[in-house]
Every structure is written in structure tokens, then in C-alpha cells.
């Protein structure tokens, strides 16, 4: 979606359809008339800045895209977009660094909206020792490194399960954001050599682990994602912290041995 070539009504309609809402559904959620919403979408009525932000809130549109809606309607963007090293984000940057450091000796990393690496703690690099150098050159894309044939893929024991998990996660990101760059990444990753279809998880499984073969043995990790709770800056809204935890005591011991020899 390009706010410079599409009218604001068309953009709103695309977001409504992306959220699988009828005009009646959105009008009821936003407490406006269906007629007025229809007029906004077809260009017969020009929405106020407040109305645009209200509709964007109901549609859960990302901050970056809310700025594009405002621009398409002739209004100034509302949400700042600073680089992570901007002095205004010093507090947030310190929080990220503190969280990454505090998670050691377990791996943790910060990524942007396209899954490009922004920062990582000292436990990440030893896990990437078998990755081709060109994949580690900035911008390092975490999903590409995970699934590329010259990345971690040959070392992931349950590659079929992990690949299916990552692609589904990326598909959900695309669904939420409508980001064409993420779609391009999805198409690229989907085109990598695919392992046999994943077998079902054990009946007592509650999540998909990452089972990684390393020089000291096979480690099993579970992961969590942390985001800032109330961001009003585009960069912070799109930043995620991925933290890995050993799934069992044996993996924790293997990780300790790997880091001791790094």
C-alpha cells in the first residue's frame, strides 16, 4: 500500500478488508454510521484527522501505516520515527541493552519489523559459528540465517517443524502489517529447499522447540518475544526482543559448555 498514490479512502478500505470486517462491522465498532464510512472509503467525504486516527485504532493499524494514512489525507504524520541511537530513545535503548545482558548466559536478540538484527547478547554469536559469513553481514536477517541452506538450517534437527513455525509466524506478521517487504522475505524463505513435511509434535508438547546441533551436542530451546507496551514512536513499536531458554537441564549444561569454550 502506497499512501502517495492511493487516496485515503482506498487505503482504509484495504485495511478493513485485511481485517475481514464489513463496513457495518467497522461502523459499529467505531460508532459511526455505515453511510459515513462508505462516503469516506469512496472519496465522497474527507475524514478529519481525529476520525482517521479513530478508525485506525479500531482496525489496529500499525503506527507506520497510521502515518501513511494521515499523509494520504493531507495531514502531518503524528508518530515519530527515530533511529534507535537517537538521544530521545536513550531510555528505551538502555532498557533493551539491560534486558539482553540480564538474559545471559541464555541467547537474546533485538530485531526490527523485518527481522533484521539490531542487537544481541554474548550468547548468540557462538550459536552462529557454522553460518556462512555473507549471511552474517549487516543487515543480518534472523529468519534468513535460520532457514538458509548455508545458515542454521543444516544444523536444526527438527527443521521441518521449525521452518513451518517460522513461516507461519512470518505469515501472521504480514497479515497484521501488510508489509510488502515481509511478503518478499516470505517468498524467498518459502523457496529454500524444504525438508520432508514435519511430523506431529509429541502429544504432551505445548510449543515448538528449536533443536540445534552444535559442536558440543544437540540443544533444545524455547523462545519468547517481548515488545514495548505503549510505544508512540514507530521504531519502538516495531522492535521485538527474542529470548531463548534451554528447554531442559541437559541443554542448559551444553550451552554452558559451549560458551565456556567460545
Which ranges hold each PLM region?
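A short, Lys/Arg-rich alpha-helix, primarily the initiator
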Residues: 1-19
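Conserved hydrophobic/aromatic packing and binding residues within compact polymer-binding modules
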Residues: 12, 26-27, 37-40
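Alpha-helical residues within the helix-turn-helix
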Residues: 17, 28, 57
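Recognition helix of helix-turn-helix/homeodomain-like DNA-binding domains
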Residues: 31-46, 56
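Short amphipathic recognition helices of helix-turn-helix/homeodomain-type DNA-binding modules
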Residues: 50-53, 57-89
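Hydrophobic protein-protein interaction segments
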Residues: 88, 97-106, 111, 118-262
Amino acid at each position: 500500500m502506497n499512501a502517495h498514490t492511493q487516496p485515503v479512502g482506498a487505503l482504509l478500505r484495504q485495511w478493513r478488508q485485511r481485517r475481514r470486517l464489513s463496513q457495518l462491522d467497522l461502523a459499529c465498532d467505531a460508532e459511526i454510521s455505515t453511510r459515513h464510512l462508505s462516503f469516506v472509503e469512496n472519496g465522497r467525504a474527507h475524514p478529519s484527522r481525529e476520525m482517521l486516527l479513530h478508525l485506525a485504532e479500531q482496525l489496529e493499524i500499525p503506527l507506520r501505516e497510521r502515518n501513511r494514512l494521515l499523509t494520504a489525507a493531507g495531514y502531518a504524520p503524528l508518530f515519530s520515527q527515530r533511529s534507535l541511537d537517537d538521544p530521545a530513545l536513550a531510555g528505551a535503548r538502555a532498557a533493551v541493552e539491560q534486558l539482553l545482558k540480564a538474559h545471559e548466559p541464555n541467547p537474546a536478540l533485538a530485531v526490527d519489523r523485518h527481522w533484521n538484527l539490531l542487537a544481541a547478547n554474548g550468547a548468540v554469536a557462538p550459536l552462529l559459528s557454522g553460518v556462512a559469513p555473507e549471511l552474517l553481514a549487516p543487515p543480518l536477517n534472523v529468519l534468513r540465517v535460520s532457514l538458509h541452506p548455508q545458515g542454521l538450517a543444516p544444523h536444526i534437527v527438527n527443521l521441518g517443524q521449525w521452518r513451518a513455525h517460522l513461516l507461519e509466524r512470518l505469515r501472521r506478521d504480514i497479515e497484521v502489517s501488510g508489509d510488502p517487504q515481509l511478503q518478499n522475505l516470505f517468498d524467498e524463505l518459502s523457496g529454500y529447499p524444504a525438508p520432508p513435511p514435519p511430523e506431529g509434535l509429541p502429544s504432551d508438547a505445548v510449543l515448538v522447540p528449536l533443536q540445534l546441533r552444535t559442536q558440543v551436542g544437540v540443544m533444545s530451546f524455547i523462545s519468547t518475544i517481548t515488545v514495548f507496551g505503549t510505544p508512540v514512536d514507530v521504531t519502538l513499536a516495531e522492535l521485538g526482543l527474542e529470548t531463548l531458554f534451554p528447554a531442559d537441564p541437559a541443554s542448559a549444561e551444553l550451552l554452558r559448555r559451549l560458551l565456556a569454550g567460545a
